[in-house]
A protein has these predicted regions:
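A membrane-periplasm/extracellular boundary helix in multi-pass inner-membrane enzymes
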Residues: 153, 157-163, 246, 266-311, ...
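Alpha-helical transmembrane segments of multi-pass inner-membrane proteins
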Residues: 141-168, 174-247, 252-265, 378
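Long extracytoplasmic/lumenal interhelical loops at the membrane interface
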Residues: 38-43, 47, 299-367, 384-386
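A juxtamembrane structural motif centered on a specific transmembrane helix
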Residues: 1-25, 388-390, 426-442
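N-terminal hydrophobic segments of proteins, predominantly signal-anchor/transmembrane helices
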Residues: 25-44, 58-125, 401-408
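Interfacial loop-to-transmembrane-helix boundary motif in multi-pass membrane proteins
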Residues: 23-27, 80-91, 126-173, 396
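Transmembrane alpha-helices of multi-pass inner-membrane enzymes
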Residues: 260, 397-407, 414-442
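Hydrophobic transmembrane alpha-helices and their immediate junctions
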Residues: 226-233, 256-268, 276, 281, ...
Length: 442
């Protein structure tokens, strides 16, 4: 912590730097990048099947600005958390170099894993570098609040009138996907029932599961940031109803976990009197009733909801359990590959694209799992989680990341932009807020 605080003081004391045009331009790029990746993450086109989104372009521009400044000024000052993030990226860079040399998979196959594991973590680095004041964090969170409002509005309009009627090519849906098919949303694994053309609500994310995972990640933070109690409760209600409307079973489980965490926090809160606990329990008890009425307006979603939580479907993990079991059996037989993973180096059986941790084991083994989860857990435990009793926003960040870590066992959407970007963005905001709080105590 002391080393991180020294690094923090060196950065926040750069008055001339903060007044420079370079810094102001970098901040503008950063703010645009954050807003786009939360609000319009699919804006852009595809080149050779690889998404070239506006959010990715602004992220790369921001990283380039950071990189040029570090080289130009020889400012090689990194906090402990940043070092862990960079070490994780270095591991994955080396691992994918071996993948490339192995020649068993083509560039178009492994680049989709490379970018989220090697490039997107630098979101944390650049945000930590360019954010030097608490008011910048406040501005970003306000920006994200209005961004999620836009996402909610698009989603509800699509659910009511049809996705095709409320889609803007190149902005709310990738332009290449849009022109390739008039039924593009049905081709993105958005069906809610076999043989039924009704699609999950996708809003501006183009995929129901991707939408659900991302709003679970950052909406708890935004909810806690709202000062007015009435508006905060309205936001929570809209958030819950929107999660139901996504049609994503992963999102449904995630919102249940989030509400369960909220209940535990309320009951264990030392200052909570009996009336507050009773009121909280009453509100939570009403949620299934409101949800049932809401689902009655969307019979396809209701049918999916009833079919989703049978023993057979839970055990099947939405069709993922068979390939996951095959991968586990592979590691039992080929234990020599458990450390670094077989991907691109040898033949293997089984797969686990959606299940983030099993996919990471396939790509980089246990070492890869440590390289990915290690920095996240370090930031979560030593920084954001340490101050949750002092800051509602940090509490929301911690809850959102914990929910993501849990649901990523089944559906992490890690390989689809903007999940990894938003994950590191939320962690960066929590980490930086923790440092500001430590600094204010001095």
């Amino acid at each position: 912590m002391l080393k991180d605080m020294n690094s923090f003081r060196q950065r926040t004391g750069r008055t001339l730097y903060e007044k420079s045009i370079f810094y102001k331009v970098s901040c503008v790029l950063l703010f645009i990048m954050v807003f786009i990746n939360v609000t319009f993450p699919k804006a852009g086109i595809k080149l050779g099947g690889i998404p070239l989104t506006v959010g990715n372009v602004f992220l790369m521009l921001t990283i380039m600005m950071w990189f040029f400044y570090v080289i130009w000024k020889r400012c090689f000052v990194f906090s402990t958390a940043e070092k862990y993030v960079i070490l994780g990226c270095i591991y994955w860079l080396i691992r994918f170099m071996f993948t490339m040399v192995g020649g068993r998979v083509g560039l178009s196959d492994w680049v989709g894993f490379f970018v989220p594991l090697v490039i997107y973590p630098f979101t944390f680095i650049v945000m930590n570098y360019f954010i030097t004041e608490q008011k910048q964090i406040d501005f970003i969170i306000r920006m994200l609040l209005w961004g999620t409002v836009i996402v909610f509005v698009f989603g509800f309009l699509q659910a009511a009138f049809g996705i095709e009627k409320f889609s803007i090519p190149g902005l709310t849906v990738n332009y290449t996907d849009y022109i390739s098919s008039t039924n593009w949303y049905a081709e993105k694994y958005n069906g809610v029932q076999e043989g039924v053309t009704y699609s999950k609500t996708v809003s501006t994310y183009q995929n129901g599961n991707l939408l659900g995972v991302n709003i679970l990640l950052f909406c708890p933070m935004i909810y806690e940031s709202i000062e007015n109690k009435t508006w905060r409760n309205i936001y929570m209600l809209v958030f819950i109803l929107f999660c139901i409307l996504t049609g994503s079973k992963t999102c449904w489980v995630g919102i249940f976990i989030y509400l369960f965490i909220k209940v535990i926090v309320i009951v264990n809160r030392k200052w909570a009197d009996g009336r507050k606990v009773q009121f909280a329990c009453l509100v939570i008890a009403m949620i299934p009733v409101v949800a049932a009425i809401f689902l009655g307006m969307f019979p396809q979603i209701m049918e999916r909801f009833k079919d989703s939580f049978t023993f057979k479907n839970i055990n099947d993990l939405s069709g993922r359990s068979q390939s996951m079991n095959e991968l586990i059996n592979y590691f039992i037989v080929k234990t020599e590959w458990i450390l670094t993973g077989p991907y691109g180096l040898t033949a293997y059986w089984g797969s686990s694209y959606e299940m983030a941790y099993f996919c990471i084991l396939m790509l980089g083994g246990i070492a890869g799992l440590i390289a990915f989860l290690g920095p996240i857990m370090f930031i979560l435990i030593k920084y954001t989680g340490k101050h949750i009793k002092e800051s509602r926003i940090l509490k929301g960040i911690t809850h959102g990341v914990i929910v993501y870590i849990i649901i990523a066992f089944v559906e992490g959407a890690l390989w689809l932009p903007p999940t990894a970007i938003n994950l590191w963005m939320v962690l960066a905001l929590g980490y930086k807020m923790s440092l500001f709080m430590e600094e204010n105590r001095k």
